[in-house]
């Protein structure tokens, strides 16, 4: 079923048939304040900055954010699509201080909660890594949503993925895209 230019539904997941006019990277929005493990925070909060992944921190090739340990409270959301290069089980990881969540597929678009996150690394904590797995098909553009929040103290965020044939990596070159017309999906 075609829903719009280049969009179809397959098994309940909105996928992209081709990346044009989509561009490399994820759309990043930063907010003042800690989202306190409430994913809907981002729908009502006013962004302080937004744009694509800057090359100095959250890059097109790496989704990572590291702070200065200044105790500032902030939250970040990244939106876009993940394009698997192989058909197999993908393991996604977030290593964060404090909370981070990642959704891929239909749950990234709507109905996303902490309970249905692909990766649930919630709560206030020092850097810790959590992971989740999902079967993905090569060549299908899956919606992806990553949320991160810093409540105080140290702050860090790194996103990785691996498969049985792909060594764990932060390199998402050619794997993530976003729609500049809608700032994400």
Give the location of each predicted region.
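N-terminal low-complexity, intrinsically disordered "leader/linker" segments enriched in small/polar
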Residues: 1-21
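Acidic/polar, compositionally biased interaction segments
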Residues: 18-185
């Amino acid at each position: 079923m075609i829903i719009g230019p280049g969009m179809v539904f397959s098994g309940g997941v909105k996928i992209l048939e081709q990346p044009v006019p989509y561009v490399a990277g994820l759309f990043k929005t930063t907010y003042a304040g800690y989202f306190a493990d409430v994913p809907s925070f981002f729908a009502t909060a006013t962004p302080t900055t937004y744009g694509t992944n800057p090359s100095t921190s959250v890059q097109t090739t790496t989704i990572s954010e590291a702070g200065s340990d200044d105790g500032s409270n902030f939250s970040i959301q990244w939106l876009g699509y993940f394009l698997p290069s192989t058909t197999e089980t993908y393991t996604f990881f977030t290593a964060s201080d404090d909370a981070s969540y990642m959704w891929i597929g239909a749950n990234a678009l709507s109905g996303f909660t902490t309970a249905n996150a692909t990766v649930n690394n919630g709560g206030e904590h020092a850097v810790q890594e959590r992971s989740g797995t999902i079967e993905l098909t090569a060549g299908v553009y899956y919606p992806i949503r990553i949320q991160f929040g810093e409540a105080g103290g140290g702050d860090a965020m790194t996103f990785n993925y691996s498969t049985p044939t792909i060594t764990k990596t932060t390199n998402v070159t050619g794997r993530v895209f976003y729609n500049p017309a809608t700032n994400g999906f």
